[in-house]
């Protein structure tokens, strides 16, 4: 997928040894729905910012019928999908106070382990890595931090019926020429129970 020209509204982050003014895209968040039974589902993303792309088209939310295997049928156009896609500008300050510095050549193995621990299944993990690995594997190092409430509070999900399990993986990362010291991030394992919703996406800082 070609990169869209998208920017964050201006904000400042203290990063490494200086202050960096950044305006960067939130890329390829995709949402998967796994109800226990075939279920009509309403999905809204309440964004502190603005959308730059959605697929299928976002009409004040998505109204769909979801199957247990993850297949999604749109009630707007009767087409079927395997996920809901959005991309946009989110007004928040990513947190790099903890994270990981990973050699480019070791990024694939790192992501496989980290994403599995964070709760992604094989297909979700593979799609995440297929999208991001080409941008990361040739860097000397990658600084990686998975965002938590500082992201989800600015891009809340409103889903009806309410899911039993919600897994949201947002990776903020930056290519590095040299390794730096950083406090390791604690990754919490998530167990899937009942109606499960999964979202993943990422942000690169250059």
Predicted features by range, described:
Residues 2-3, 106:
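Hydrophobic alpha-helical segments, principally membrane-spanning helices and signal/leader peptides
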Residues 3-10:
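Sec-dependent signal peptide recognition
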Residues 17-18:
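C-terminal motif of bacterial Sec signal peptides marking the signal peptidase cleavage site
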Residues 21-206:
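Protease-labile, long low-complexity intrinsically disordered regions enriched in Pro/Ser/Thr
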